[in-house]
Amino acid sequence: MASQPPPPPKPWETRRIPGAGPGPGPGPTFQSADLGPTLMTRPGQPALTRVPPPILPRPSQQTGSSSVNTFRPAYSSFSSGYGAYGNSFYGGYSPYSYGYNGLGYNRLRVDDLPPSRFVQQAEESSRGAFQSIESIVHAFASVSMMMDATFSAVYNSFRAVLDVANHFSRLKIHFTKVFSAFALVRTIRYLYRRLQRMLGLRRGSENEDLWAESEGTVACLGAEDRAATSAKSWPIFLFFAVILGGPYLIWKLLSTHSDEVTDSINWASGEDDHVVARAEYDFAAVSEEEISFRAGDMLNLALKEQQPKVRGWLLASLDGQTTGLIPANYVKILGKRKGRKTVESSKVSKQQQSFTNPTLTKGATVADSLDEQEAAFESVFVETNKVPVAPDSIGKDGEKQDL
């Protein structure tokens, strides 16, 4: 009896396991292409690489504004100092003295969508040029406002002096009116003089009295004219003194500030005390405030008092001239190093201390010289004993010398 073929599989028996192939037996498992190859599917031994730690938010992201404003104060802070003074006298300058933030430069981004790469590159490339133009414009505006304020102050002072002089002139008029009531005294005085001349008690004539009185009046008028002439020229001198003295004082203040800034960055070149650190990972700067470095580079860090208040970032220098921010978790602090100025000052202080103690130094020198003389004497004595000498040696003077 022939063998019968096996019955066809039932529908429930043809159900395949997910991931099974079309043929019999378990097929290959499928894997999404988005996942990519794993370590188990890579050929060969997997390479272990050091993954740099994540960078903390940059200063621009922490402050919510442009990174330029972190270490570079806005010029609006300088010109806003005239705002309180200019609101009463120069209201037209107050909108100009608050900067250009309303025009869109350095504005806060309200939308969550990041700008395109072209816009970012354009802003980064044009930032320095616009800042230079802005500083020049603010400088001219500040100078013009200063001159306008100086003119107003001098003019107000001049008006105050004129008001005082006007009050004094009015006071003089009032006193003249009061003294005019004493005309009777003058009449009595005139009659008394006439009586003295008639009786022969006074030998002066009336003409001489009139000439003397006129000379006194002319002298008083000349003094008043000279005082008025000299009083007319002092506002001009005061105005030019303020105009020339103001910029000079500003220049002195700015030069002092630049010297302080130069002294404050001497740590970068190693002149002052600084902290030494070694880079552990590579870092590429993305803004002008940051500096790039590679693993193994030695960096000079500013002291704690000179560090900016930015979380996770340190102020450092790589070449001794350019300073910038670096991530704190990318470097390893090695320690504090004294600057060259400190070392030189310590050497000078030691030399001064040695000069202030001459007796100790002199005693040490004398002791050293005595030791050297004794050592030299011993060496000479030993060499003399080694040299064979005749028992009777004749010196230069013809006498015998015993050694």
UniProtKB/Swiss-Prot annotation:
Segments passing through the bilayer: 135-155, 175-192, 234-254
Record-linked InterPro entries: Peroxin-13_N, Pex13, SH3-like_dom_sf, SH3_domain
Organism listed in the record: Homo sapiens
Limits of the SH3 domain: 272-336
Annotated region (Disordered), positions in chain: 1-68
Cytoplasmic face residues: 156-174, 255-403
Protein name (record): Peroxisomal membrane protein PEX13
GO biological process: cellular response to reactive oxygen species; cerebral cortex cell migration; fatty acid alpha-oxidation; locomotory behavior; microtubule-based peroxisome localization; neuron migration; protein import into peroxisome matrix, docking; protein import into peroxisome matrix, translocation
GO CC annotations on file: cytosol; membrane; peroxisomal importomer complex; peroxisomal membrane; peroxisome
Disulfide bonds listed in the record: none
Region (Interaction with PEX19): 175-196
Region feature Targeting to peroxisomes, mapped onto this chain: 145-233
Subunit structure: Interacts (via SH3 domain) with PEX14 (via SH3-binding motif); forming the PEX13-PEX14 docking complex. Interacts with PEX19.
